């Protein structure tokens, strides 16, 4: 039985998600699989790639051949280099940052100075650098000038 590591498409129209699976080469793309070894979400920015490295290494060692797309993902995660025998394979996939329950969000994720309940929010009239309605050209009808 020829076994392949390939992508199984799931998701909605124009919102694809893929599972990296081990399947018989004769089955359909989205057909029965032997084992799921990872996930790939190309729509997210940056793309999400997660591969169960020990299981992928096992299937590669017993002769499973990856498709071109699966091979590209295995190279990104460093699993292909590890299978080929490189000593220090490097993964070019960033690990997702998780925020634990007790910790606060990173500084880049925090909102700047929250507005208190009694404070007024700034309006357009508070900004002198923005043009006002009275600065509109005079040849424009009044009903158009009043709209913003």
Curated annotation (Swiss-Prot):
Chain segments annotated as transmembrane: none
InterPro entries associated with the record: Ribosomal_bS16, Ribosomal_bS16_CS, Ribosomal_bS16_dom_sf
GO cellular component, one term: cytoplasm
Region of interest called Disordered, as start-end residue ranges on this chain: 95-148
Pfam family, one: Ribosomal_S16
UniProt key word Ribonucleoprotein: yes
Alphabetized UniProt keyword annotations: Ribonucleoprotein, Ribosomal protein
Keyword Zinc (UniProt): no
GO BP annotations, alphabetical order: translation
Name of the protein this chain belongs to: Small ribosomal subunit protein bS16
Species this chain originates from: Tropheryma whipplei (strain TW08/27) (Whipple's bacillus)
